[in-house]
Amino acid sequence: MTGHPLDAIPPELPVYPLHDQVIFPHMSFPLFIGKEHMGLVEEALRNNRLLVVLTVLAIDPITGREQFARVGTICRINQVLRFPEGGCKIILEGVNRVRLITTLQVTPFAMASVSLIPERENRNSVAQALMQSIIALLRVAQSLGQMLPEDAHHAIDRIDESGKLADSLAVYLNMEVKDQQRLLETLDPLERLKDVYLFLTTEIQKMQARGGGSADRSRQAVRSQKEHLLREQLKHIQNQLGEEDPHQADIRQFRSIVQSDEMPEVVRSVAEKELARLERINPSSPEYTVARSYVEYLCNMPWQRGTSDILDIDRAQQTLDDDHYDLVEVKERILEFLAVHSLKSSLKGPILCFVGPPGVGKTSLGRSIARSLGRKFIRISLGGMKDEAEIRGHRRTYIGAMPGRIIQEICRAGANNPVFMLDEVDKIGQDFRGDPAAALLEVLDPEQNYSFTDHYLDVPFDLSHVMFITTANVMDTVPPPLRDRMEVLRLPGYSDEEKLQIAFKYLIPKQVSENGLDKHPLQFEEQAVLKIIKNYTREAGVRSIDRQIASVCRKVAKAVAQGKDAPEVIRSDQVEKMLGPRKYFSDVAAEEDRVGVVTGLAWTESGGDIIFVEVSTMAGRKDLTLTGSLGNVMQESAKTALSYVRAHHADFGIDAQVFENLDIHLHVPSGAIPKDGPSAGVTIATALISQLTRRPARRNVAMTGELTLTGRILPIGGVKEKVLAARRAGVTTVLLPERNRENLKELDDHILAEMTVLLVDNLSEVVAHTLIPDTEHGPRLFDCPQHLAVDPPSGS
């Protein structure tokens, strides 16, 4: 309990002699008063309930008079409990240190004149460090044995003044009277703290000697506290020399940021609380690093700091055109955003998803968009990510906790409105640590991401100003709720003509510059580039073309570096010398019309491609064998196709008895590549009919479409990619579902002029366009027992 300060004291006060005890200011102390001292108590009650308590140092053996200490404590009587037989119990409260001036009387009780000793308070860094060290030593002592009562620990933890802490511990600790009196007479609080610290250290060493097993651990704790004390003293000396304490410099810098107008109010309140906590933590403590990192993130986050958008639509159009060829739909969407943003400043960032095969420019397009808007660009790859904490962060209770990648990158960018690209969103994993795709639902939802709460920050951050762009090769593996939050923009593959334009406009100048050929003029003939495209690459994008052009440039650079004659123009006949034998052939479609082999079209992560469906029959018991690493959906498509052919055998001139004595083997090369999807249904059915009727399939016809049990052909995706793949493979006629008519608008006019694209609605139309009538090749019967052979149909 803290006593009330005294402005003045009476000239004479009764003195209570205390043997073998010392009373300190701010402490409550019970005393039992005998009858012989009741007059002293009555006198004190008349003098504002005040009396002086002096410790008796000795008694004169001749006179019997008590010799008082020169420094004592003026106390206030808070409570008097009188006993029936005489005497009483009083509760004294220490108020202030006093110095004995003179003793005025001795009998019947001592009266003296005293003077108040002003209480000094020392709040410098050394005193604060000593207080923290003493508290830590008390915890060490408590682990070795109960040095203080439990309630005393709680009381001491609440003391924030160095002098009071030293006085309180002097009462609770088992100190000798002479040591307590010396502390009472020590007026400098810092010196009193040092004495208490030394006493605690000595006591702990004694307890360690008795404690045994835990001695090493406790000794290390004491040593750490000593080191901490020395460091704090060093800081105090540095301050006196004008050298600033780095810890205090950080605190001041953080506080200036917290008190600025940039932080939202809810974040400021959390930051101020953490900053106050940081000030109380010992900088050498591991907890200090954790707290400082958290405060640093709070101060460095761009809560209301962003870049100014460049709202010049013509300039943005020029920037996008300079970086990327074609991609009209994507560019138009960005310009629409700019136009709306120029009319309405408080516009939420769009959530776009670029879907297309590798190498078509999805990632580089995001960087170009950021440049056209004048925004910071951030990119993280989600491929293989399996830990939800990568998105939401770790809670600070974990060792090594950090924010999620979203908050980390925004903090690093220093702007709250960057263009943020989440690459490979279709390749996110999932395991026991959570589902990152589910964590992205809040990030990519404009109705929720204005208050995105990272587990580490634990305060909301507004993501609504961020323009999120995700990329994917296919959308099949993206969860439907996540897909629903994104505006999907498809980037189809490029035709050979488009690749040629991209090579001359972007790839060749880039590789010439990167390979140090700026001073050596190097040009490519158009036929040379076309030869590279057709003979050395087979992809929907332009990544392989870029690598082949880079290989040519490196060989020229090598010749220049060696002082040899280096070509200035790359001609068509030089390509094979530099890149070796051709790797791909344009006429990869079947070289001849074959029975049971039909060309289909597939859509993969790498763009469009052609596939061959091969069917073979043999005597057996109606077994259907499927090989070629076919997925469940494709296997079901094969069974559906066979069921349709059996149900409508008469329409195709097939005897029903054929199916009772045959095994059918269906294979789709290459066997090591997994294949799946429903769009091969019409191709499988056509191959079955070709084999069972012995009618060859035209080698220059390719098809795609999902077949139903009723013979209808359902629409499919990736029309442009599949048509381009057919064109690369030398196919001249492509059969597409009638319901994909609108998708033909994606194809350039010159492609439609070069190829024949037929729209079909049922399997009969497909058979008519694909299988060669028997009149062209003569009768063909499949190899089976003669009694099973059927007459070839007259036509289809």
UniProtKB/Swiss-Prot annotation:
Lon N-terminal domain boundaries: 13-204
Uppermost EC category: hydrolase
PROSITE patterns given in the database record: LON_N, LON_PROTEOLYTIC, LON_SER
Annotated binding of ATP, by residue: 356-363
Induction context: By heat shock.
Pfam families the UniProt entry points to: AAA (PF00004), Lon_C (PF05362), Lon_lid (PF22667), LON_substr_bdg (PF02190)
Record's GO cellular component terms: cytoplasm
Taxonomy, superkingdom: Bacteria
UniProt function note: ATP-dependent serine protease that mediates the selective degradation of mutant and abnormal proteins as well as certain short-lived regulatory proteins. Required for cellular homeostasis and for survival from DNA damage and developmental changes induced by stress. Degrades polypeptides processively to yield small peptide fragments that are 5 to 10 amino acids long. Binds to DNA in a double-stranded, site-specific manner.
Stated family: Belongs to the peptidase S16 family.
The protein's name: Lon protease 2
Provenance organism: Syntrophotalea carbinolica (strain DSM 2380 / NBRC 103641 / GraBd1)
Gene designation per UniProt: lon2
